[in-house]
Amino acid sequence: MAHHTHQDWLDRAARLRPPTGHHIDGADEPGGGPSFAVVSPRDGRTIAEVADGGAAEVGLAVAAARRAFDAGPWPRLAPADRGRALMRLADLIEEHRAELALTISLEMGKPITEAYEIELRAAITTFRWYGQLADKLADEAPHVAPDAFALITREPSGVVGAVVPWNFPLTLASWKIAPALAAGCTVVLKPSELSPLSALTLGRLAAEAGLPPGVLNVVAGDGPGAGRALGLHPDVDVLAFTGSTAVGRHFLRYSADSNLKRVWLELGGKSPNIILPDAPDLDQAAATAAWGIFFNQGEMCTAPSRLLVHRSIAERVTDAVIERARTLRVGDPLDPGTEMGALVRESHLDKVLGHIDAGSDQGARLRTGGARTLTGTGGSYLEPTVFDRVAPDSRLAREEIFGPVLSVLAFDELDEAISLANATEYGLAAGLWTSDLSTAHRVSRALRAGTVWVNCYEEGDLTVPFGGMKQSGNGRDKSIHAIDKYTELKTTWIQL
């Protein structure tokens, strides 16, 4: 990565020719019907016209996945053989790392350095990790009686529909695809219509890695068309979705209206980040708070968008965050020196600006940012934004913004901080900064969040699960626990 200059990436972008058709039954399907434009948020230009899939294309993909599961070799392979196929796919992603990072940066606006170093590394690691896990899953044989034998086996659920958003198009896809394939399932992936190109490339690489036809299918299309068709399809056994809470509710309804398929949801967040006066390093806490909210343009479900600071240190911490916001380099996502890129599309930028206007109208104090920037580029760029004096019942404090907007709330007592942290419909993640181990345990238990980071933020590993409480979803991605989403437990009782 270090040897690629801004001009290198611009030259590569000029030569980039990603696939633009669906990947169904092991082959690229160019499609002859309607298409939609993929517009780059870096400059507002169309980078590709992609086949627009709907119920017909989803039907073909599900049929291919059904055949591959019911009659194909994949679920019947030795688990070690499935694992080797996943590791071959990881190797191919590694070989095409620059191309995929460039594609992601172009289609959704994140800095190329983050796409290459963080997103692609995560996707590669995920396929390798589950490839290595595939043959490590053991059945159970509990002792039940002297004259009987019981066996508990874990069997693949069947056809999995995976629907993923645009903010981490390959990382989030890999978190669903890799454990599902390791378990022996087949998959139909529907990426966001805002970032389909990297997923379509992944489908092509899966075929090159030797995955049998129908094992991994990719259909491009929007939510009302392809997403709804996948959610309602009676031959889909499991639906795994990452996205907004509102759309997650749709998938629950689709399940109820079709075959009661299992639905796993990783949804929105409004994550609190609590800084106490005894934090081991207040400067580090402030720097991490700034990094967390501005990373990936704040377009993250786990973004620490609510900074809860003890009143005695609120001014110091807030000033440090503001200083970092003002020096953050916002620019062309293809420039390796860019620290914050473009928001995914103009309409999303307008939505974020609406939240900023509402914050000011509801009495919050805008300390820095809050306006468009780089307006001559044609792209959708926003200044890093910080509010303080935010009312706990305001939109800034309660609604997911999904942009680089930080709300600072001061508190006086620890119980008040816990109450503020939990005063939201979401429960995805939270942060806490303290030197007291007892406080860390007490607060972690009290916070209704699937992940609590203490003296850090956004740390993780594939060995630990990820997911939310309350309206942030159900089930868990990552770790061995993700296998539970794509398998069924069967009891076989044999009377001797």
Residue ranges and their predicted role:
Residues 46-53, 70-75, 162, 273-277, ...:
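Short, well-ordered beta-strand elements within core beta-sheets of diverse protein domains
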